[in-house]
Swiss-Prot record:
Primary residence: plastid
SUPFAM superfamilies linked: F1F0 ATP synthase subunit C (SSF81333)
Location of the protein in the cell: Plastid, Chloroplast thylakoid membrane
Organism: Galdieria sulphuraria
A Pfam match: ATP-synt_C
UniProt name for this protein: ATP synthase subunit c, chloroplastic
């Protein structure tokens, strides 16, 4: 039974990282495209746009890191496997 739980945990860890990277990846691409467009329209606002973009990219990247933490806990500190 532990081997089935271990196999499911590995699959779940892979899905956690993969799915946690899709949303922020799309969001970062969209945010960067809009920032470039905004800088092209108003070059004088480049500093404010860049600062806001970097802060929002950091928040989006945090979601991916949370997925990685879930995956690592499933792999190395799995609560479903009896030790």
């Amino acid at each position: 039974m532990d081997s089935i739980i271990s196999a499911a945990s590995v699959i779940a860890a892979g899905l956690a990282v993969g799915l946690a990277a899709i949303g922020p990846g799309i969001g970062q691409g969209t945010a960067s495209a809009q920032a470039v467009e905004g800088i092209a329209r108003q070059p004088e606002a480049e500093g404010k746009i860049r600062g806001t973009l970097l802060l929002s990219l950091a928040f989006m990247e945090a979601l991916t890191i949370y997925g990685l933490v879930v995956a690592l806990s499933l792999l190395f500190a799995n609560p479903f496997i009896n030790q």
